[in-house]
Amino acid sequence: MASTAKATLTFDRHMPSEVPRIALVDTFEDEVRESVAVAKAMQGKLQGVRLDTPSERGRVTADLVKEVRAWLDLEGFKDVKIVASGGLDPERIRYFIDEGAPVDIFAVGSYISDARPIDFTADLHEIER
């Protein structure tokens, strides 16, 4: 695929309509340009854009989220949600909230999957009434 818009349109053609259309928008171009391009290409069927910028490129910041939201709104895509992901933990989520970043969904992965195990037992006991 040569663009995120083309990839998202292909996904849209082949997936059942009940599957949400959320596009990862930091692959080929700037996140803002890709977000607007995909929203335009999807003609009202895009539910969200996912920002997952790697740390080598500055990672997802509150300013980036605000800029994406401003451009989506300016272009008439106020209903498109913004998903933030990429190394999120409680501190990073608090940062976005404190900065007033308009994140609709926080996608948390490795913080949960890499969590320290909690040792416990689950015993069954019969209790007479």
Annotate each PLM feature.
Residues 59-80, 85-129:
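Gly/Ser/Thr/Ala-enriched C-terminal appendages of enzymes
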Residues 1-75, 90-92:
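Buried, small/hydrophobic-residue-enriched core segments of structured protein domains
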